[in-house]
Structures are given as C-alpha cells and as structure tokens.
Amino acid sequence: MKKMKKMKNKKLKILLSAPRGFCAGVERAIEIVEKSIQKYGVPVYVRHEIVHNKYVVDDLKNKGAIFVEELEEIKDKSRPVIFSAHGVPKKIPEDAKNYNMTYVDATCPLVSKVHREAENLSKAGYHIVLIGHQNHPEVIGTMGQLPLSSIDLIQNEDEAKKYINKNNKKIAFVTQTTLSIDDTKNIIKILKEKFPDIKEPLKEDICYATTNRQMAVKNIAKNCDIFFIIGSRNSSNSVRLVEVAKKSGCKNALLLNSLSKIPYEKIANSNTIGISSGASAPEILVKNFINELKKRFTISIDEVETIKEDVVFKIPKKLN
C-alpha cells in the first residue's frame, strides 16, 4: 500500500500520439461483419481474423461471428462468409462460388488497389516484385492475384541487393500497405539503382494511415523516456510503430497487448511516456491503459496531433 501511495505521488506526463488507432479500412471491415450479422443472422463466418486484434475478434465472436482459416472448415456452406481486411488470393472467391456460398469481401480498398496494380502491370508485360513480409495475409493475398512465376517477394535490403531478374522481362514493384516508410524507401532505392527502368506505382502503396501513424510517433518519440504501442503481436502496422519509435529517439519502445503486462517499474523510472496504437486497435484499449496508469501515478496528458484524418470507405451495396 505504501508503495502504491509512493507511486501515486510520482508525476507522469503522457504524450498521446494522434492520429492513432482504427483506420478507415478497419472501421469498414468491422462494420461489414456487424451489418452481415444484422442482414443474414447468426452465425456468419469470417475467413481469417477480420483485423489483427484480439479484442475486436472476441467482440465479434460474442455477436455471432465464427472465425476460420479456410473455407473447408465451414460445415454449413449455406451461411455467408466474409473475407478479412487483409485481402485474399484470387482463388478464394472462386472456391466460394464453387461451394455456392454467399461471400462479402471486406478487403481494405487500399489493399485492393495494390491487387489491381499488380494485375494490370502483369498484363502489360511486367514481372512483379512485391516488397513485403512473407506469410503476412496481405502478402499472401497480393501474391495470390498472379501465377507464382509472375511475382517475386523481397522482404529487406539484403534480399533487394541479391535480387536477380531471371525472366529478363521489364519489372515493376508494388508494396504491402503496412510497412515501415523508411525501410521501404531504402529497399526501393536499392532496386532503382540495380534496375533504373523499374516501374513504380503512380501513388505509393503504403497506406495513408500507416504513414500518418508513423509520422505521429516519429514526431514525439525523441521526447519520451518510454513509448507504448497498443496493439497485437501479429499486427504488422503495430510492430512497425514500435520500430519507428526506437529509430526516432526512444530506445525503450514496447508493444502492449495486455493490461496484465504493464511494466510499472519501468514507468515509475520515467518522466514522459508516449502512447500510440496500431490501426487495428480500438480506442477503448488506450483509455483502459491510461485508466490503469491513473490508479498508480499523477498524470497529465498532452495529445499531439500531427495530421488530421477524415477518410471514410463505403461498405458494399449488398449490405445497405
């Protein structure tokens, strides 16, 4: 009790990064699941986690969604299935049609844009290089838009340096939407030096929300003794935010996915802490974290907004 009282006397400044949390693609995907439940009743099936956040997935499970990894797992094929925000290989909607299943595609429109780019460039005679992380569902979905012989994956600078254009075709690159901006720039620089004629997207593929959240974290990281990113371990954009905070001047940056894992001793040795959240993390998780801190410290909060966001994506007409 004395220790708690002593901590309560400790003053702590919170720099709250903005924008943070849900992006338009995530909000759209969650709304698609909720509207599908309203329209079709329960259960509705969702192929893969709709977004990479346990809180969101558990909430939708409670509302009547059942999550599977493959269509074969769905015993009652008369029930609708929703494809996650990360996108799916082209084969998946075809399989759903063969099963006579009703499906709703919750792929983020910005991921769908990358799919179209890859397809159009391939049709125009280009061999495609995808910059991204192997086994991430978005990467699996993008690579699945084309025959495997038409697309290669590059994950880092080392792979970019070693990459050989075996097809002797003209090449073009596209990227995963949730990458580190700075790391991706370095990979692109290497590819452009090796292949001066490489074709790039008309507009960069890293999405507005990824860019804005990384800029916002970068803006305040150097002023923080410790930085917390609220998000799940399998959330690519959340993990990238931790990396950005570390590279931008706050070596003590951590991913927090559970209130039971708050490192109070580390916080007690800090004066200023930064807080942001990944694009799939709901704001309630940030509020819950701050409320836990209020129980133990005397805190002041300064929200630092780097850029305003007003992007909204429409849901499919069939759900209106």
Please describe what each predicted stretch is.
Residues K2-I273, S277, E283-N320:
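The feature marks the mature, well-folded catalytic cores of soluble enzymes
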